[in-house]
């Protein structure tokens, strides 16, 4: 603001102040003079009552007008849309104010275009950033908006409610044991591997820092935590007795033979049963799980003693009479139910 503009502003404020003082001073003279004249008259009480009553009525009327004007002004402001900006001379007579409004509008438009896309990647702790805000050269390892703290908490929830620690089914723990106690019992106690001991201690420190520091989990902390989980998950598989028993069961040939000869289930990919071999083409590789043998093969392998198929196998059936003779022999054989019970 220039010096001339400041001078005009000071003159305006000073003249307004003087005018208000004079107006109030001359307005106070009238009621004071009325009260003084009424007190000198013969009927003092009646005159005083009239003067004071007139002043009270005048004050109430002024207050009513002021309140009504305020309410009317407020109702008029409600009719104006919220997004309306006074830029016309009728709305804003002051020219400098209108120019300031227009300049700020142009500036806001420039800032909107400038800040629409951040210049640098915006990565906040606690959540996986979206691809558009992430570093373009970094590999996207996790889903967008992944909550790191919830993922880490799920590990302790599985340990607490399911007794499962890093896919290890052989977790021996008490109700009062913590995450650090389980890690110590699994990877620290009676362990001579220095690398595993060092990583186990780092794993415990990282977990306690994440869970109890009160700060959001950073991406680096979460990636490090996931690497520890993968590492100790592989280590725990070699120490899980249930997994070892299952592994031995798969590699034990005697178990396969027993399953083939004494049960209707087989895990041997080279089963001597030709009917079971017919189904092997459904598998891309020899299956390691139990495969149920076909009930048709069971029936075919238990031939009743009442049927003699020696001649039929040596002499193929060429005529209708041969087929009828074979059908007659089969009708004399045991039923399907008796064959299954055989």
UniProtKB/Swiss-Prot annotation:
Q: Which InterPro entries match?
A: DLT1
Cysteines joined through disulfide linkages: none
The entry's cellular-component GO terms read: membrane
Q: How does it sit in the membrane?
A: Multi-pass membrane protein
| Entry keyword Isomerase | no
Q: Which residues lie on this side of the membrane: Cytoplasmic?
A: 1-15, 69-342
Q: Where in the cell is it found?
A: Membrane
Question: Which UniProt keywords are given for this protein, alphabetically ordered?
Answer: Membrane, Transmembrane, Transmembrane helix
- Extracellular face residues: 37-47
Which parts pass through the membrane? 16-36, 48-68
Job description of the protein: Required for growth under high-pressure and low-temperature conditions.
The family note in this entry says: Belongs to the DLT1 family.
Protein name in the entry: Defect at low temperature protein 1
Could you tell me which species this protein originates from? Saccharomyces cerevisiae (strain YJM789) (Baker's yeast)
Query: Corresponding gene?
Result: DLT1
